[in-house]
A protein has these predicted regions:
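Short beta-strand segments enriched in hydrophobic/aromatic residues
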Residues: 74, 129, 144-146
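Metal-dependent nuclease catalytic cores in nucleic-acid-processing enzymes
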Residues: 58-64, 113-142
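ATP-dependent helicase/translocase motor core
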Residues: 102, 134-190
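Short, solvent-exposed loop/turn segments that connect beta-strands within catalytic domains
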Residues: 78-80, 110, 133-134, 150
Length: 190
């Protein structure tokens, strides 16, 4: 296999300063940084309030079967980077990880960069859960819950552990490369 010179596996982990420390980043923050495409405004208006979002998550998870787990803590390391977060939902029987998003209005009007961000989050969580549980593949689902109509719209895909791990490493490499550059810039400035 020939690797591109700028790929994470060809370059190895980008150094963070200081190299002995661990830099912790949330899954959402990692993906917001690495998965941005197009317009940087990630608002989809009119958006639900924080309380409505929490309530919507509760409605969706209450609809799931026995054994369904919510707010599943996941973490994984890549070089000096520790990525962690809480997956919205996990069905261990179906091996299905859900990323739940609340919205109002017409989902067809949601900007594409939002969906890319949401898939990035689901795929990073998918990589982490495959690693944690030793799975070869996992079902991933974006569950969009309309606050006003109380309806769910679900988009699904199957993620192979190796592909999800490669995606995870790519996001980490991008973030770590930026972080090293930012640290060097701040050191030179100060």
């Amino acid at each position: 296999m020939v690797e591109a010179p700028n790929s994470p596996s060809a370059q190895g982990p980008a150094p963070l300063v200081p190299p002995a420390s661990v830099y912790t980043v949330a899954v959402r923050a990692l993906c917001e940084f690495t998965a941005k495409r197009g317009d940087l405004d990630l608002r989809f208006t009119p958006s639900p309030t924080g309380a409505e979002g929490v309530e919507g998550h509760g409605v969706v998870t209450a609809r799931r079967g026995v054994g369904y787990q919510t707010e599943v803590a996941l973490s994984g390391d890549w070089g000096p980077l520790r990525v962690r977060g809480r997956a919205d939902g996990w069905d261990p029987v179906a091996r299905r990880l859900e990323e739940i998003k609340t919205y109002r209005g017409d989902l067809a009007h949601q900007p594409n960069n939002h969906r890319q961000l949401h898939w990035a989050q689901a795929r990073v969580y998918g990589a982490l859960i495959c690693r944690q549980l030793g799975l070869q593949q996992v079902a991933l689902a974006l569950v969009y819950y309309n606050i006003d109509t109380r309806q769910e719209t679900v988009f699904s895909e199957t993620g192979e552990a190796a592909a999800l791990q490669a995606f995870f490493e790519e996001q980490c490499w991008r973030f770590a490369a930026w972080s090293a550059q930012e640290t060097a810039h701040r050191a030179a400035r100060d």
